[in-house]
Every structure is written in C-alpha cells, then in structure tokens.
From Swiss-Prot:
Pfam families: Pur_DNA_glyco. InterPro entries: Formyl_transferase-like_C_sf, MPG, MPG_sf. This is Putative 3-methyladenine DNA glycosylase. PANTHER family: DNA-3-METHYLADENINE GLYCOSYLASE. Keywords: DNA damage, DNA repair, Hydrolase. GO terms for molecular function: alkylbase DNA N-glycosylase activity; DNA binding. The lineage of its organism: Bacteria, Bacillati, Bacillota, Bacilli, Lactobacillales. It comes from Enterococcus faecalis (strain ATCC 700802 / V583). Its EC number is 3.2.2.-.
Amino acid sequence: MVKEMKETINIFNTKTTEEVAQYLLGMYLEHETATGVLGGYIVDAEAYLGPDDEAAHSFGLRKTPRLQAMYDKPGTIYLYTMHTHLILNMVTQEQGKPQGVMIRAIEPVEGVDKMIENRQGRQGVELTNGPGKLVAALGIDKQLYGQSIFSSSLRLVPEKRKFPKKIEALPRIGIPNKGRWTELPLRYVVAGNPYISKQKRTAVDQIDFGWKDEENEKSNNAHILRGTT
C-alpha cells in the first residue's frame, strides 16, 4: 500500500499533465463519508495545461481567490462550480505551475445505493458519467478544496486500480472558440467503458467494460449498469 502510493505521488511530481491524466484512468477514487465509503474507477479525464491553455482557468497565469489551490503542490484538490455543479480537479505540476486534470467520469463500485440516493434516484450509466454527476454521487463538497488527493477523506487508492485495454485521446468537451485548444486531444478515456459520455452504444465493451482481463476484473459489472448492488 505504501509502495503504491509513493509511486502515485512520484507520477504527480515527475510526469507531464497529459501523462498524469492517462495514468489516472483505472485509478480507484474513494470518498470516506459519515455514512460510509463511496468509490469507483476513473474512466474519463481531461488535461488542462495552465498559462498557455486558453481553456484553463489559469490561462495567462490568472490569479484569483478561487484559483489559489491551482498554484499549490501536486495532488491538491481544486473544486469549482459550473452551472450549479461542483467539478473535481487535481493539481498535477510543481507549486506555482498551475496545471491540472479534471475528472469527468467514474465507474461506480462501492456504496452504489448511497450514490443513487445522492443523485436523487438516478442510476445506471447516468449515475456518474459526467463531472458534476460523479461529484454529487460521491458526496464531495467544497470543504475538500485545497486538501490533498493523497491523504484527505477523498483520496486515490492505487492498490485497487485497474488497467485499461486501450486509452483514447479526444478533444475536450465544452471548449468552443479557443483556437487550437478546442481541438487538441487532451481528453483521455477508457475505450469502451459504458460510463463515457458522448460515445456510440456500439462502442461499449459489454463484457469487460474496457478493462484488461486480469484477476477479479470481470466480477459484478452488469449489476452496476442496472443500478443495483
């Protein structure tokens, strides 16, 4: 456990933001709440490259009170509100270099019934197939802003991770009129996972959900899609 977390922290400290985004696919994201532990596998993530990225909040080294966490150390949780939805990001570069990864979707695993309750009864792929949806499902709130994704109640659990068969790189969603930054393939997804939004139904891997065929990786997938535990 300690070894795996050290490796994860090292990735955040030494790799590019694009590499960290891809590394996070298959990573287990867990939130310990007062009513139990909720968690799942990250399947969709977008890289934001800071001062040069016209779609990034920190474009041009913009600094506001809301952006303070983006300038903190790797692994810092950056939360912001968009259209009433709270969005989860993680800082991926050294302090003072404001780059990060937005988590767009997870495949829910633990505490699914509570996630459904948190989402007012929504279930199946609609439970966590968007950035605001997964934050609501996991019960994430603004109190986590500025805390560490390695050691807070919301944390990465590398010893539980899975590995994608294939990673696809796509343009980010909802980035209009930003020149080349609109089309750059900075969104990374687990190809074939049903919790990926805006994909053809025929592209979904109904057997393995896009994961490599390793021990225990096929267990109990179908019941989650049906929204049952």
